[in-house]
Amino acid sequence: MSSHTALPVEPLDVLIMGAGVSGIGAAAYLRRNQPNKTFAILESRERMGGTWDLFRYPGIRSDSDLYTFGFDFKPWTKAKSLADAADILEYLSEAIDEHQLAPFIQYQQKVISANWQSDKGLWSVRVEDGRTAQIRTVECRWLFSAGGYYRYDQGFSPRFEGSEQFKGQIIHPQHWPEDLDYTGKRVVVIGSGATAVTLIPAMADKVASITMLQRTPSYIINQPANDGVAAFLRKVLPAQTAYSLTRYKNAKITLAFWGFCQRFPKLSKKLLLWLTRKELPKDYPVDVHFNPPYNPWDQRLCSVPEGDLFKAISAGNADIVTDHIERFTEHGVLLKSGKMLKADIIVTATGLNVQLFGGITLHKDGKPVVLSETLAYKGMMLSGVPNFAFAVGYTNSSWTLKVCLLCDHFCRLLGLMEREGYNVCEPKAPEGVETRPLLDFGAGYVQRALDSMPRQGPREPWVMSMDYFRDVKLLRRGAVTDKCLKFTAVPNAPLHADVQLQQQGSRR
């Protein structure tokens, strides 16, 4: 739906927040596995695609291969393993068409808050129309948050002393101007994460100079743009079979390397630095610019397709400076070492602001839900919060690997509740259970938000697992029920629309 129209018969079975990768995946799973359930997707922006439509900076691409970043039910058939945003948006659009999801998506509809009503067994959800600012209320049995984990309206921008004096442009990649012409300009990119290492080679051929200014280096690895095994399998096997085998292969390799880094941090560090040295000139100071003070996978590794960043540096088209910023000046950035980086454009690729569940406020019978006092159940529900599910992917692998498992498990849960006659499901955390941060991840954007996030426990089902194959056993093959889930049937709760029609017909 390109504009606000009436939702299907309320209360909806499932209300999905967000029409990005996770939201489209959740809706497709419902269509495939629970075709009788009513649902709608509310998207706060004007278009689908989430991250891949929001970010418009040069070179934007995935940093995970599309065989694992894609949906398990929809093969990725293009040659490129690391895809750009346009290809990913095309893939998502195809998924919408193939599952006839377009009529279920309402754009510019922002969920503001949701209140669980125990007496009715329903969520009352307040929604703001982005065009008229009018507020309406939608009722649903399940609320599914698929809006990612960061604020769409604001990236993280630390205050730099003297920034108001700079005469050039200061740009955050999350809000890239469509008309920006950087041809022949001197550019400084502040940051060393995935965005920075994508921007540098994408801009290098047009600028007069471009420098990646980093306070702390990142581990950066060369990744082939194409997957030779996948190409061979596509020639000899049906598309879905070839895709599934490639997906399995890549998930295994990624998890095995992550496990190797966790078990042998010193050895893995030496290996990564050795690989980096092979990509750069012999006299390049790798230990200065590519040697982080933390172990591999304490923060996410950065992938560069066909070593494009290394090639730009080796050709003299890009530069890296590792230093601290003293202040901005009229003409660039003054470093604490005394060095001056002259610039016409400064790009602050300094990260994201974490915001779970789209920033909505959750209530239970009018009382606010304090997220930091909840525990994540199977990485998809919250203790003490009935009929609420969410999709947060892996930090050590492809996001969508986890999302697909969560959506599959969610559909199994809906099926069980329908068969058993339940309409309410609520995880109950054990008394006095030891807790720890939801994400054991050193990235700055995660660390800044830990105090406002749910927690996790010491063991399943309260662990926020980062192991895909462990999660396959738990979420796809394991039992739906356990002693931590409380199921109830709320008397006189509104019935599913199909049941209402059947009963009305029998009365006639």
Curated annotation (Swiss-Prot):
Classification via InterPro entries: FAD-binding_MO, FAD/NAD-bd_sf, Flavin_mOase-like
Keyword Coiled coil among UniProt keywords: no
Root EC class: oxidoreductase
Residue numbers binding NADP(+): R61, S62, D63, S192, G193, A194, T195, A196, V197, T198, R215, T216
Binding site for FAD: S22, E43, T51, W52, D53, L54, D63, V111
E.C. numbers: 1.14.13.-
The protein's required cofactors: FAD
Domain of life assignment: Bacteria
Record-level Gene Ontology MF annotations: flavin adenine dinucleotide binding; N,N-dimethylaniline monooxygenase activity; NADP binding; oxidoreductase activity, acting on paired donors, with incorporation or reduction of molecular oxygen, NAD(P)H as one donor, and incorporation of one atom of oxygen
This protein's UniProt keywords: FAD, Flavoprotein, Monooxygenase, NADP, Oxidoreductase
Its job: Catalyzes a Baeyer-Villiger oxidation reaction, i.e. the insertion of an oxygen atom into a carbon-carbon bond adjacent to a carbonyl, which converts ketones to esters or lactones using NADPH and/or NADH as an electron donor. Preferentially converts short-chain aliphatic ketones like 2-decanone, 3-decanone and 4-decanone. Some acyclic ketones are converted not only to the alkylacetates, but also methyl- and ethylesters are obtained, indicating insertion of oxygen on both sides of the keto group.
Record PANTHER family: MONOOXYGENASE, PUTATIVE (AFU_ORTHOLOGUE AFUA_8G02570)-RELATED
Protein family (similarity comment): Belongs to the FAD-binding monooxygenase family.
Protein's recorded name: Baeyer-Villiger monooxygenase
Annotated organism of origin: Pseudomonas putida (strain ATCC 47054 / DSM 6125 / CFBP 8728 / NCIMB 11950 / KT2440)
Taxonomic path: Bacteria, Pseudomonadati, Pseudomonadota, Gammaproteobacteria, Pseudomonadales
